[in-house]
Swiss-Prot record:
Organism annotation: Pseudomonas aeruginosa (strain ATCC 15692 / DSM 22644 / CIP 104116 / JCM 14847 / LMG 12228 / 1C / PRS 101 / PAO1)
Enzyme class per UniProt: oxidoreductase
Chain segments annotated as transmembrane: none
CDD domains: ALDH_F6_MMSDH
GO molecular function terms noted in the UniProt entry: methylmalonate-semialdehyde dehydrogenase (acylating, NAD) activity
Name of the protein: Methylmalonate-semialdehyde dehydrogenase [acylating]
Record-linked InterPro entries: Ald_DH/histidinol_DH (IPR016161), Ald_DH_C (IPR016163), Ald_DH_CS_CYS (IPR016160), Ald_DH_N (IPR016162), Aldehyde_DH_dom (IPR015590), MeMal-semiAld_DH (IPR010061)
Residues that coordinate or bind NAD(+): F150, K174, E177, S227, E382
Amino acid sequence: MSVPVRHLIAGAFVEGLGAQRIPVSNPLDNSTLAEIACASAEQVEQAVASARETFASWKETPVSERARVMLRYQALLKEHHDELAKIVSSELGKTFEDAKGDVWRGIEVVEHACNVPSLLMGETVENVARNIDTYSITQPLGVCVGITPFNFPAMIPLWMFPLAIACGNAFILKPSEQVPLTSVRLAELFLEAGAPKGVLQVVHGGKEQVDQLLKHPQVKAVSFVGSVAVGQYVYHTGTAHNKRVQSFAGAKNHMVIMPDADKAQVISNLVGASVGAAGQRCMAISVAVLVGAAREWIPEIRDALAKVRPGPWDDSGASYGPVINPQAKARIERLIGQGVEEGAQLLLDGRGYKVEGYPDGNWVGPTLFAGVRPDMAIYREEVFGPVLCLAEVDSLEQAIRLINESPYGNGTSIFTSSGAAARTFQHHIEVGQVGINIPIPVPLPFFSFTGWKGSFYGDLHAYGKQGVRFYTETKTVTARWFDSDSVAGTNFSIQMR
């Protein structure tokens, strides 16, 4: 019998009252782990009302007390680190080591939120005019919503609600219906850390519940991570209903390999960055651009990828796990077939991959294409699977031009021993996050996650300084205190006197 997935509404864990039921499947064998009873419209309304009511008192809570909640929370997350990683592995299929990294990168954002007193500091200028001072203060927005994807069940929720709540907001989390269990456990620990009931709500469901939140007049801001189509929908629907929205969407990330790079380092980093987590990362390297003589390394890249072995999450020798569901597997295999039809050279074929003991798992083996061109579907589309494409160019300038022509701009990297080449690349590339001899340049949380172009819809990015700005409003105060009864005369201009 499957376990019902609970919602957190108004400080209580409850079962959903909506008509729709969604099974939560184990990607290793597609057995049912749990079942979601979606939230009813009345429950979503109750969650918003509870968040709004709690916000009224939470925003008045001293910032030092809010920071102490975050300090207790990060300590609990560290204490339960392995437990959380096992939940991630069970519902997503990630290897245990990868799942531990998922949890840890989320903890780093909570650690950043612990510094909220400093993050909220405003600015002051004395004597902007005679005896007049101007200063800014930072205030929370109100009820904020986070809609998170399946591929990082711990990290991405932790990108959102701890920082938003530390800034004084209340938060409604709508996790992916494919991986809801991690979010429920994160919420349990948050209450255990001393967060007031109602400051965090967890609502499960699909488009119906998302639409209700996107259009609700009491919701002030929406954070989203997911696919291009849904990301565009969330952004346009949310902004049309006067929400502040940050929407992180698709990606197609390139690694430029210069012939002067350390070959062993290149191959090792490329393999992990392309097929790690079964390629289900928005920052995965899906295209390697071989410059000049680096094209001679193709046989060694193939040999290294051929040694990669998918397997179950508790197999310490497994490099990655299954993809999320049979539909994802079918789509990846369709794109591999289309790549062959369009003329790419298939050097490794991951279709039909089998893992002993798990015949019904969503397995895709490591896949490698050479001779890939920008007009091919395997190049254009975000595959979101363990598929690496190799493109060849003659110069760094051609590599930069190739990447800049992509509609996406999430992440990119260059491997080289030349400082001049690295400087040219970072200056001219039209991508928001750049790695120099770093394959997946996801910044630590005191910087922001800064995707560009079609990878991001909005103005303010996640965590870091931009994350604080996203979850707050700035109020500027100009003040004068009179120290005598004298009146200088009526001022009819806009000058300050």
